[in-house]
Amino acid sequence: MPPSGLRLLPLLLPLLWLLVLTPGRPAAGLSTCKTIDMELVKRKRIEAIRGQILSKLRLASPPSQGEVPPGPLPEAVLALYNSTRDRVAGESAEPEPEPEADYYAKEVTRVLMVETHNEIYDKFKQSTHSIYMFFNTSELREAVPEPVLLSRAELRLLRLKLKVEQHVELYQKYSNNSWRYLSNRLLAPSDSPEWLSFDVTGVVRQWLSRGGEIEGFRLSAHCSCDSRDNTLQVDINGFTTGRRGDLATIHGMNRPFLLLMATPLERAQHLQSSRHRRALDTNYCFSSTEKNCCVRQLYIDFRKDLGWKWIHEPKGYHANFCLGPCPYIWSLDTQYSKVLALYNQHNPGASAAPCCVPQALEPLPIVYYVGRKPKVEQLSNMIVRSCKCS
């Protein structure tokens, strides 16, 4: 008579076979997305970009070079392109919002503009065309110790009575006392005061990251080519002289200020590890060792890769693409797996697993000619900045 263990073996074999077929732990690298040859992916990405650019410009085919004027681009066109490129670069330099930071309540702080009798204003020529607003960055850092904690920053101005409609523009003080355009506003006539608000989150983050002591804005009347009068007609509270006593105190309290919304420092410790991991992810994505879903570098040279000479600036750009498997949990004891099985039964050629797709995209400014006329365009969603599994 065989031992009891051998007698039970026929009964145990089906159970052992079931355990082999049914993993009890996540299949970390499992993905039903088909793997593709890297060179094939790059070629397909290049062809997709060719069609994408023509489609965004509403062109059926690349424009003819025609009689393009020789020499460099006109100065005005180049200045417009450079300002557009700088604005895009400034926006892309802003850190991505922290999902965990968004959970916490935000502390709101008001930082008043440096008063107009400060010597910093003496460095800028008084003009009927503009007003200047400067802020002490030490006060900003006291309110927001780290740039990543800043959720939103608004420049608030109290506009007094305005008799005529006026188009105004806001600029940021840049390096070498130059000014970078930020935004504009069309102000309608009004008999009552009104608060104006400009979103300057990215600018304040830059200030917090740099070591400067005083930073500022300029509000100017729109310089119209067909108008000789470019006087700033709007009266902003805090710049009118001749007030005394309590009225002057109230007037000074309502001078321009920055409204800051940030995660308090005592709640920030929890975010340190997640920020560190995300910073490492960026490095991993551009290394050859990372196999999972990540941003892969791809530089497009317009002449070499597309055979185009009609785009004058830039000569090329980093389009990038997303590639890599997306891990997910596969277990037969979940309802999700039953749905997947049913999905695969009815769609045998489809992928039920998450796939690597773009998450954040950036625009691309270009200069090109239509006949003899140069044009500056901003093409949306042309640069892959980050990827996700979806």
Swiss-Prot record:
An example Gene Ontology biological process: positive regulation of DNA-templated transcription
Tissues expressing this chain: Highly expressed in bone. Abundantly expressed in articular cartilage and chondrocytes and is increased in osteoarthritis (OA). Colocalizes with ASPN in chondrocytes within OA lesions of articular cartilage.
Residues annotated as site: Cleavage: 278-279
Glycosylation sites per record: 82, 136, 176
Straightjacket domain: annotated span: 30-74
One annotated GO molecular function: cytokine activity
A GO CC term attached to the entry: axon
Region named Bowtie tail: 226-252
Presence of keyword Glycoprotein: yes
Highest taxon in the source lineage: Eukaryota
Post-translational modification: Transforming growth factor beta-1 proprotein: The precursor proprotein is cleaved in the Golgi apparatus by FURIN to form Transforming growth factor beta-1 (TGF-beta-1) and Latency-associated peptide (LAP) chains, which remain non-covalently linked, rendering TGF-beta-1 inactive.
Consequence the record notes for mutating residue 110 to C: In IBDIMDE; decreased TGFB1-mediated activation of SMAD signaling; reduced levels of secreted TGFB1
Region (Arm domain): 75-271
InterPro entries tied to this protein: Cystine-knot_cytokine, TGF-b_C, TGF-b_propeptide, TGF-beta, TGF-beta-rel, TGFb1, TGFb_CS
Transmembrane segments annotated in the record for this chain: none
Keyword Transport: no
Subunit structure and binding partners: Homodimer; disulfide-linked. Interacts with the serine proteases, HTRA1 and HTRA3: the interaction with either inhibits TGFB1-mediated signaling and the HTRA protease activity is required for this inhibition. May interact with THSD4; this interaction may lead to sequestration by FBN1 microfibril assembly and attenuation of TGFB signaling. Interacts with CD109, DPT and ASPN. Interacts with EFEMP2. Interacts with TSKU; the interaction contributes to regulation of the hair cycle.
Function in brief: Transforming growth factor beta-1 proprotein: Precursor of the Latency-associated peptide (LAP) and Transforming growth factor beta-1 (TGF-beta-1) chains, which constitute the regulatory and active subunit of TGF-beta-1, respectively.
PANTHER family linked to this entry: TGF-BETA FAMILY (PTHR11848), TRANSFORMING GROWTH FACTOR BETA-1 PROPROTEIN (PTHR11848:SF125)
Record-stated family: Belongs to the TGF-beta family.
Note: TGF-beta-1 is inactivated by fresolimumab (also named GC1008), a monoclonal-neutralizing antibody.
Illness: Camurati-Engelmann disease: An autosomal dominant disorder characterized by hyperostosis and sclerosis of the diaphyses of long bones. The disease typically presents in early childhood with pain, muscular weakness and waddling gait, and in some cases other features such as exophthalmos, facial paralysis, hearing difficulties and loss of vision. Inflammatory bowel disease, immunodeficiency, and encephalopathy: An autosomal recessive disorder characterized by severe infantile inflammatory bowel disease manifesting as bloody diarrhea and failure to thrive, global developmental delay, epilepsy, brain atrophy and encephalopathy. Affected individuals suffer from recurrent infections associated with impaired T-cell response to stimulation and decreased T-cell subsets, including regulatory and helper T cells.
Designated name of the protein: Transforming growth factor beta-1 proprotein
Organism of provenance: Homo sapiens
